Amino acid sequence: VANSQPIRVGLMGFGQTGRQLYELASRSDDIEIVAIADIGAPKILHYLLCSEIKESERHTLEGNFLVNPRFKSRLIHIDRPEAMPWDIYGVDVVIDATGKYREARDMQAHLDNGAPRVILRSLPVDSIDRIIVPGVNDQAAMVSDRMISAGSATSSALCLLLKILSSRFEIECASMTSVHAYTSDQALQDYAGSDFRRSRSAAENIIPNTHEAHLWLHEILPEMSDKVLTYVLNVPIHEGCLLDTNIVMKDAKVGIEDVNDAMRSAAEDYPGIVGFTDDPIVSSDVIGSSLSLLFDTKGTVKAGTQTIKTLSWYENIGHAARLLDVVRLYSTLESKGEVA
């Protein structure tokens, strides 16, 4: 980042993604979390942070401030965008990590309260300025963007896979199933919700679910628009996800090793974002990986003449790392604008 001053980030939501963002920022040299909006009690928020990270002694609670060796963050008992006075804290950007406020009007509320720019941790509900997936469409970012989504962990993994393979081979169509750890909006016991299947216990069931990634491909990866279907199976594990993708190639000559070689090369082209493994790993082996996509070469098989099935791994902290990459991307654009 060209700017010598740390990027001042405001954070709404201190759930799993919020805590991962905070921990990653505390180990960076260019980002500071200056304010955190969450209705949790400060002692409990600090307790949850320390319970799931290494070197928890780095983080202390001093009154209403979370403190680490790099910066201190004010904890504010607020949970709605329209109630949070971001202007008081002089933030450069706000990350909404709640997963709840995905409409443009919610993002506008952040802007109205002093956030120069707001980035969603999830896909939006309606039209916003930009969806940016690092490694896929970084070049689409514009300094005028104010309401931005960084996609989701699943959409990032899928778009990276499709971009890499479609740059090497002609793809007819594809279908993706994410075998996904349960999420915080699922109930541990059967509980009447808005969706029949998601009303069943997350701890006891494999739960089929829809996924919206394919609906946004026209913005993120236009060449794959209308060629992909996406689906999710939520399973009873805490962390670690598997992307099971079936790709129909136009050229029947494309084989298993062609695909594996393409992904091995991509690991060099996308350092820190894409990797590969030749080991027979399972979901717990990917926990803690900050990659957006870890390609499993042992999972590549061919069915018939044109269908290639691939397996790729990812976990939520990889998406948290990409959120901070999007923060850096826009900070760099701002700095270039100032120089110009």
Please describe what each predicted stretch is:
Residues T230, L242, N246-A340:
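C-terminal active-site/capping subdomain that shapes the small-molecule cofactor and substrate pocket
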Residues N205-T210, I281:
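Active-site pocket-shaping loop/turn-to-helix segments
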Residues S194-N205, I237-V248:
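Glycine-rich phosphate/diphosphate-binding loops and the adjacent beta-loop-alpha structural elements
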Residues S156-S175, E212-L229, V326:
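Oxidoreductase and adenylate-handling cofactor-binding alpha/beta cores
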Residues I148-S149, S201-I207, L229-V235:
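A short glycine-threonine-serine/GTX helix/turn-capping micro-motif
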Residues I39-P42, P124-V125, S152-T154, S178-D185, ...:
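Glycine-rich beta-alpha junction loops
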Residues A140-M142, R198, P236-C241, K302-T305:
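Short, flexible turn/loop "capping" segments at secondary-structure junctions
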Residues A2-L188, A192-S199, L333-G337:
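N-terminal Rossmann-like NAD(P) cofactor-binding subdomain of oxidoreductases
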